[in-house]
Structures are given as C-alpha cells and as structure tokens.
C-alpha cells in the first residue's frame, strides 16, 4: 500500500507549529502551576500543597512533630506527583528563619544554615505547622476558598488558602518561570498591617501615601538598605533595585589595632562563601590591610576582620563593599498571578489584592455561618412548635405505626417540613416531654439575633472591612515585631549618574525587541563586509530596527504603537559585547499587553528649539515641544491621543531655527488661512519649478537645496505629502493632532521622514523592488492633501513597505516573510525619477514577500551624527528635569534575584 509523502517544507512547517504549541502549553503550565505565586496567599502550588497536607495530617501547632519524610510522602502521593527533593526543600525553607521573615513551619533537627549547609535527610528531621502557618489555613473548613481536584481527581485541594497572614508581602517570594521571573522582598508585619488598615479605610490612597506606612523591605537577616530611590521605584512601578549593605562597626582592640565587626549580612548571602571570598581577595592582594578573618557566629552573626595597625578601617571596608557580598543589590520584581494571569504589581496593587481576597474569605465564611445558623434555627422553630403542642405531638407519635407515618402526620398537622419532623421523631419521648422550654427559647432568640447579624454583615461592606481589620490587628498584636533592616541614606548621597563617566554610545534596537549599547570606539575598527558589529550577536531571523548615538547620560524616549511614551537612561541599558544581542527592552520600560516599540528618541537636554513630530497609520500628525517630555515617568504617559483603530507609526525629533520655532508655536488654527498659506507656498514652489524647467537644467532642479524643515509622510500605496514643519502649530502632550495626509481607501501611512540635505528617498516594495529618488523632485504641498505619487504601485512590484531618507553609504538590510535576508549598499539601488517603479533589490521565491527593511548608517555617519548631536545640544540651555518619578538604578556588581527552583 502506497503512502502519501508529505512535502519537506510542509512537514517542517507542521513540526514547527507543533513544537510552538507544545512549548506554549509547557510555558503556561510552568507559569501558572509551578513557578509564580498567587497574589492572594503568596504561595506557589508546592507551598500550598505542603501546608494543606500538614493540615489534613493534623500536624498542627498544638500537636507533636512528625517525620518530614511522612509529610513529603503525603504531599507527593496525594497532591504533588514530582520529586521528593523539591517538596522537602520547600518544607525546609519555610522553617528557616534566615530565609523567611516569618517562618510558617516549626522544624526540629538540622534544617540547614546561613552558611549554605543543606538540611539533614528527611528521615532524620521532624516538622509541624507553627501558629503563623496555621493562620494561612484559618476558616478553610468554612468553604472560604475554591477547591479543585488533585492530579488524579481522587481528592480535592484548595486553589488558594484563606491567608489570615499577608504572606505574600511579609515573606516575599522568588521563582523563575519561562520568559519571566519574580523576586519579592519581605516586609515588616506591623508596617504592612498599618498599610492595609489605611488602604482598607481609604481606597483612594496613592502609592506615595502607602509608603508612609511601609518604609521598605525588612529582611530576615537585617542589614541596611542604602537609599530610598530604589524602594520608591519598586513600590510605584512594581520593579526596582535596592542596595543592601552589611551592618558593620569599626572598633579598636586592646592592643590598639583596628578591626571590622560584621553583625548582619545582606539577604540570601552565604556567610561561609562570603568569608572565603574575603580570604581569597586578601591572598590575591586585591584588598590590602587585612591580617585575619574569623567567623565567631553562634546564634547571631559575628564576623571579625582583623586589620593591620596602619590600615585605615574605612578604606578597607569600602573595598570590601566594592568587591564582596558585604554589599549587594536586591532586584525587586513583583510578578504574581492575578486571576491566573501574571501581572506586575505595585505596592498598592499587592495590598489591594490581599484586601479583596480577605473580604471574599470573610464573605464566604459569613455565608457558611449563616447557612449553618439558619439550618439550626429552622430545626429550633420545629421544636418550639412541638413544645407548644406537646400533648398532641406525643399522641400523634404514639398513634403512628411507623416513623414515616409519624413524620407525615406531624408535617400535615403543624405545617412542618421533612427536616423539622425528623428532628422531633429523632428525640426520645422522655427528652421531648422534659424539654427545657426556657433553654430552647434562649437558643431561638440567640439564633434570631445571629442570623440578623450575619445578614447585616453580608449587606454592609464596612462591617466586613471591620471584621477583616479586627482579625488582622489580632495577628499583628501577637506576632508583629520591630523592624530588623534599617533604611539608611543613599551612599554618598550621589546619583548613579555622578558615578558614571559621560561617554558616547551606539544604541541598537532589534526587530525582536533586544536593545544594547556599545562604546562608539567599538565601531572605529570595524571592517567592511559581513554582518558587522551592528548586527553581530542577533539571531539569523532578527535584524537591527534602529541605530543611533547618545551619551550615557542621555534620556531615551521610547514610543509605542499605542501612543505612549516611556523614559529610561542610556546607562541603564546593558553594555553589550561585540557579539552580544542585548536584553529585551521590556526589562527597562513597563510595556503593557499588545504594546510594541515604534521609535526611540535620544535626548541629551530638554530644551532648545526642538519638537517631536508624530505620524499615525491613519494619516494624523502632531507636533509637541520637547520640553513637554521633561518630566519622566517610569510607568509611562500618553504622548498622543489615538483613534480606536489607529496606531503610532513614527516619531521624529526635529531641530529648527528660532524663527521657525516661533512660527511653529504661533501657527494659526484657521483652516482657511492655513490653506492660503500652503497654497502660496505651493505656488512659489511651482514657479521655481517652471523657472528651472525653462533653463532646461533638469538635473540641477532635482538636486536643488532642500529646506531643512521639510517633513514627508509616505504611504503604503505610494503617495507622499511634503510640507514645512512650521505650517502647523505645536500642541500639548496627549492631544490628537491634525490631518497630515488624505488617504485613499485601503491606504495607510508607513513612514515619516525629516528630509536632510544630501540624502535620497529610498523606497522598497513588498515584491522586492527598490528605488532612490531626489527629495527635490517631490513638490511641496498643503498639509492634509493627497500629496504626490512616490511610487507607481502595480501587481508586479507590490505596495511600499519601507520609505526612508538615506545617504549613499548606508547599508540596506531586506528581510522576507520566509526568512530570506540580503544586505546591500543603498547606492547599489539606481537613482530614478519620482514616478519610476525601481529595480529589483532582492529576488524572492514564489509566494514570498518582503517583510521589512532597515537602513544602517556607516561608521563614519555614526561618528558624525554623534559629534553633531553633541555640538548642537551643548549649545542648549536645558530645562530642569523632574526626576522624582524615575528612580535611578544602581550600577552594581551583583544582583540578588530568584534562586528557588521547584519541580
């Protein structure tokens, strides 16, 4: 029997699609069911299952400990069918007072140490829940949380715990998923309790307000957090970095020799490795002045570093901070599951999620109590009827031949239901006769009041809030303690920028969203040909999207397709190696779902005669003074207001003369006046055309000087409109803009160009054709007109996919949909007239089309652009930048990040 052979390309496509689908399912499984905690209880599934298993086993605070192996076996067998090592590590970590600010498990035996010692084997250690751990499961039996089936659907397990303790915030967490990670700092219970109190009573409080209550992280190992800027950024944006220093003291011994005493070390630092590192640095003579190091720790940490008599303690200590983990950077990234989806959470978000969860738990517990009280009240009402008619009830029961007949007779006679009649017949006759009427009435009245009270709780949110806060106060009063970590001043009270030399950098952004920076000197030795430094390190299917120069002190304005703008500093970007691809830009700006970077504008100073010009897909343009963007916000702001079906295409930073700048600011909004002005410009341009045409020097006409303030909007279907920047007024940030071009049906804007002297207009089509045209051949027209033809679009060449102003020595990279890539010189594409179709720039396979293209400047152009920008901005008197909402990251040698892994 013959089999149909699947073509190789089709088989490859099927395999690729199947692998993508499988990996996506695996990724979501890791994210949702393994690596990220639920924002409500702060637990990953393995933590939750360990706690629930201990609850079901009865390994509770008022009972004795049991072997850890028994707990681990129960967890694996019933709820978590993975390796025992991951489960035991989780159990052990919840018992370590140097890992958790508020441990949830009481461990008996060797559960590891801050020196990196592993816990003893699970057959030797014993454990049970402590009182704080029991709080996590309080009211679980009252149906306060949703339950779900275990892995084989033989049992049920909670999908979240009631969490009377705000575990997520006070204990923090860490974890590495697929493509994302979380690392949350622990906090002080008293401070968190006060913040929850304040937010529950006043939901309008801002993150700034809440920082009055939560001062900063409170690590179990104490130490000192240097500066509040990183804390502020983390609390307001969900991610930030804090510098943590060991608590040290310089003292003099009895012989007059100085020594350094370390009493607290940064969180998650291995003490034994720290001492070894110091010893290695002394041996390698990288640190001078140390004669001995001793670890005298017992229950508390005490590291003694003996110094030479002539050593300066402060200098030695500063070197230790510089080269060892006596100083670290803790990276905060508050990523957790909200409604089963990963979300980056600010301080207010963390507190609000917990408040909402606790209110839901209290609501469900109240509903459970109400249901139980109502059921009991229903029975008591039946018994009251029985006591009021005791003789008749006894008579009915005695005369009935069976229990069912007696029940039915009671129901018919006294209008009882099945439950009430069953309660009466279940009582012995002697009990019924001797029923204490007063006791029954007292219980009845009490139940009436209880039911009314429970209903009132369900109806009034303020009562549920009061109950939540009352329970929280009890927890804080009993288990709250003093802060261990001190929040100190920033080191030297200097900005990171003051510690970073101002150097020229080349920044590249790839089409896949990877960004990096390289010193401009890196490019000076670049040889011609090949992929070059600019593209080195990128994947074959990735290419450079944008390349520009900037100072390490420059701001980058990152604009997205949704019209938002984000700020970051150049020095925060990774300084990549020649063959490095950089890091995803989402690590530096908090892009929302569906956002894509459309343009990055480097700004050295917010001042001078500079404007930002925006163009959208639907032909809207806007112009804004650069100084409007001098108040950076890490969370981003709306730069331009977009229609529902529109998106931002391009942003250009445009410099103008003082006269042009003032004309731009004062341009009239009167459409008719504007039309007259534009018509006059067009007429003057046409007169110039006629005059030059009469001279017969067409080449001179095409190469005539171009005014430096001209903009061009290019569309997919080959139209282009060219107009002066000054013909429309600058607007405020967040405004909609005005019509830049009238689009035909089905057409859209693909590019915005600032025409530069000496450059040519390069156009690439989807069928692989390209052409270069002189800017002077494009007639200046009225803004908002249909423009002139840039490209004669036909089935042969296809629509335009790329239009840019380029110099002759630019490199052009063209990428097709099927992954074909070609790199050519821009000058290799023939210079033609404006209406020409162009020449074939890339030969495509059948069915393939050009996906995109990128124009890369030469090394000389990069260096010249850098020099020009520096010269221009050096003359600018910049406005003061409000950096209050952008906290500068620490340029540190090390970051403390996620380390915990679970199977």
Swiss-Prot record:
EC code: 5.6.2.2
InterPro entries to which the protein is assigned, alphabetical: GyrA, GyrA/parC_rep, Gyrase/topoIV_suA_C, Topo_IIA-like_dom_sf, Topo_IIA_A/C_ab, Topo_IIA_A_a_sf, Topo_IIA_dom_A, Type_II_DNA_Topoisomerases
Catalyzed reaction equations: ATP-dependent breakage, passage and rejoining of double-stranded DNA
EC class of the enzyme, as a word: isomerase
PANTHER family: DNA GYRASE SUBUNIT A, CHLOROPLASTIC_MITOCHONDRIAL (PTHR43493:SF5), DNA GYRASE/TOPOISOMERASE SUBUNIT A (PTHR43493)
Keyword Cell membrane in record: no
Protein name (Swiss-Prot/TrEMBL): DNA gyrase subunit A
Biased composition (Basic and acidic residues): 881-895
Stored Pfam families: DNA_gyraseA_C, DNA_topoisoIV
Localization (cell): Cytoplasm
Motif GyrA-box location, chain numbering: 526-532
Domain of life: Bacteria
Entry annotation: catalytic residues: 124
Molecular functions (GO terms): ATP binding; DNA binding; DNA negative supercoiling activity
Role according to the record: A type II topoisomerase that negatively supercoils closed circular double-stranded (ds) DNA in an ATP-dependent manner to modulate DNA topology and maintain chromosomes in an underwound state. Negative supercoiling favors strand separation, and DNA replication, transcription, recombination and repair, all of which involve strand separation. Also able to catalyze the interconversion of other topological isomers of dsDNA rings, including catenanes and knotted rings. Type II topoisomerases break and join 2 DNA strands simultaneously in an ATP-dependent manner.
Principal subcellular localisation of the protein: cytoplasm
Topo IIA-type catalytic domain location: 36-499
Subunit organization: Heterotetramer, composed of two GyrA and two GyrB chains. In the heterotetramer, GyrA contains the active site tyrosine that forms a transient covalent intermediate with DNA, while GyrB binds cofactors and catalyzes ATP hydrolysis.
Keyword set, alphabetical order: ATP-binding, Cytoplasm, DNA-binding, Isomerase, Nucleotide-binding, Topoisomerase
């Amino acid at each position: 029997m013959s089999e149909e052979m699947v073509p190789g390309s089709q088989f490859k496509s099927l395999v690729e699609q199947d692998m993508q689908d499988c990996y996506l399912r695996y990724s979501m499984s890791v994210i949702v069911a393994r690596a990220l905690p639920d924002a409500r209880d702060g637990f990953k599934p393995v933590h939750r299952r360990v706690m629930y298993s201990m609850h079901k086993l009865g390994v509770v605070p008022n009972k004795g400990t049991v072997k850890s192996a028994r707990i681990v076996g129960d967890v694996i067998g019933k709820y978590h069918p993975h390796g025992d090592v991951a489960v035991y590590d989780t159990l052990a970590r919840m018992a370590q007072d140097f890992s958790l600010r508020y441990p949830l498990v009481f461990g008996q035996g060797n559960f590891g140490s801050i020196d990196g010692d592993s816990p003893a084997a699970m057959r030797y250690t014993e454990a049970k829940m402590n009182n704080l751990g029991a709080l996590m499961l309080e009211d679980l039996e009252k149906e306060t949380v949703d339950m779900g089936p275990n892995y084989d659907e033989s049992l049920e397990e909670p999908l979240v715990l009631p969490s009377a303790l705000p575990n997520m915030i006070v204990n923090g967490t860490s974890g590495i998923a697929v493509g994302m990670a979380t690392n949350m700092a622990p906090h002080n219970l008293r401070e968190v309790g006060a913040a929850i109190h304040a937010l529950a009573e006043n939901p309008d409080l801002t993150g700034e307000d809440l920082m009055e209550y939560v001062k900063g992280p409170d690590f179990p190992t104490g130490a000192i957090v240097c500066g509040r800027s990183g804390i502020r950024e983390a609390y307001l944006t969900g991610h930030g970095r804090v510098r943590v220093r060991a608590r040290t003291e310089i003292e003099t011994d009895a012989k007059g020799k100085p020594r350094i005493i370390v009493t607290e070390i940064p969180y998650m630092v291995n003490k034994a490795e720290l001492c070894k590192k110091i010893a290695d640095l002394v041996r390698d003579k990288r640190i001078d002045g140390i004669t001995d190091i001793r670890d005298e720790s017992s229950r508390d940490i005490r590291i003694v570093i003996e110094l030479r008599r002539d050593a300066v303690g402060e200098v030695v200590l500063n070197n230790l901070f510089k080269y060892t983990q006596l100083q670290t950077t803790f990276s905060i990234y508050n990523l957790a599951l909200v409604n089963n989806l990963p979300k980056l959470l600010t301080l207010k978000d963390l507190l609000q999620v917990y408040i909402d969860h606790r209110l839901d738990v209290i609501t469900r517990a109240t509903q459970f109590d109400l249901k139980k009280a109502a059921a009991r009240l229903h029975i008591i009402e039946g018994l009251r009827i029985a006591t009021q008619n005791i003789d008749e009830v006894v008579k009915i029961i005695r005369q009935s031949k069976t229990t069912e007949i007696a029940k039915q007779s009671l129901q018919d006679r006294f209008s009882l239901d099945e439950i009430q009649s069953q309660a009466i017949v279940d009582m012995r006759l002697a009990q019924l006769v001797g029923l204490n009427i007063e006791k029954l009435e007292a219980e009845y009245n009490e139940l009436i009041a209880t039911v009314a009270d429970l209903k009132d709780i369900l109806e009034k949110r303020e009562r549920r809030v009061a109950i939540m806060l009352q329970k929280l106060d009890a927890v804080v009063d009993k288990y709250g303690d003093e802060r261990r970590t001190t929040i100190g001043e920033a080191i030297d009270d200097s900005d990171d920028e003051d510690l970073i030399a101002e150097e020229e950098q080349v920044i590249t952004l790839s089409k896949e969203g990877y960004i990096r920076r390289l010193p401009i000197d890196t490019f000076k030795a670049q040889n011609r040909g090949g992929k070059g430094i600019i593209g080195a390190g990128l994947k074959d299917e990735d290419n450079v999207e944008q390349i520009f120069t900037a100072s390490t002190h420059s701001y980058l304005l990152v604009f997205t397709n949704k019209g938002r703008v984000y700020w970051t500093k150049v020095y925060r970007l990774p300084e990549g190696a020649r063959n490095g691809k950089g890091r995803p830009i989402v690590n530096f700006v908090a892009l929302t779902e569906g956002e894509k970077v459309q343009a990055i504008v480097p700004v050295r100073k917010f001042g001078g005669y500079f404007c930002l010009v925006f163009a959208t897909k639907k032909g809207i343009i806007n112009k804004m003074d650069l100084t409007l963007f001098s108040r950076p916000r890490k969370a981003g702001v709306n730069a331009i207001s977009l229609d529902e079906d529109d998106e931002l295409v391009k942003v250009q930073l445009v410099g103008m003369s003082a006269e042009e700048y003032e004309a731009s600011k004062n341009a009239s909004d009167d459409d008719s006046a504007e039309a007259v002005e534009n018509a006059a410009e067009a007429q003057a341009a046409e007169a110039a055309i006629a005059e030059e045409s009469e001279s017969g020097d067409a080449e001179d006409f095409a190469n005539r000087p171009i005014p430096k303030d001209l903009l061009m909007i290019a569309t997919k279907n080959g139209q282009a409109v060219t107009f002066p920047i000054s013909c429309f007024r600058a607007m405020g940030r967040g405004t909609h803009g005005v019509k830049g071009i009238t689009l035909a049906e089905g057409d859209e804007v693909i590019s915005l160009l600032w025409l530069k002297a000496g450059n040519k207009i390069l156009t690439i089509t989807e069928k692989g054709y390209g052409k270069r045209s002189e800017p002077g051949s494009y007639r200046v027209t009225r803004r908002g007109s249909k423009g002139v033809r840039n490209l004669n679009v036909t089935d042969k060449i296809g629509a335009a996919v790329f239009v840019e102003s380029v110099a002759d020595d630019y490199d052009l990279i063209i990428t097709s949909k099927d992954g074909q890539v070609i790199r050519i010189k821009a000058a290799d594409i023939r210079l033609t007239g404006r209406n020409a179709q162009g020449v074939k720039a890339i030969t495509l396979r059948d069915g393939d089309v050009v996906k995109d293209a990128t124009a890369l400047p030469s090394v000389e152009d990069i260096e010249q652009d850098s020099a020009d920008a520096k010269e221009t901005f050096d003359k600018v008197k910049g406005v003061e930048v409000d950096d209050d909402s952008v906290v500068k990251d620490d340029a540190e040698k090390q970051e403390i990040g996620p380390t915990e892994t679970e199977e």
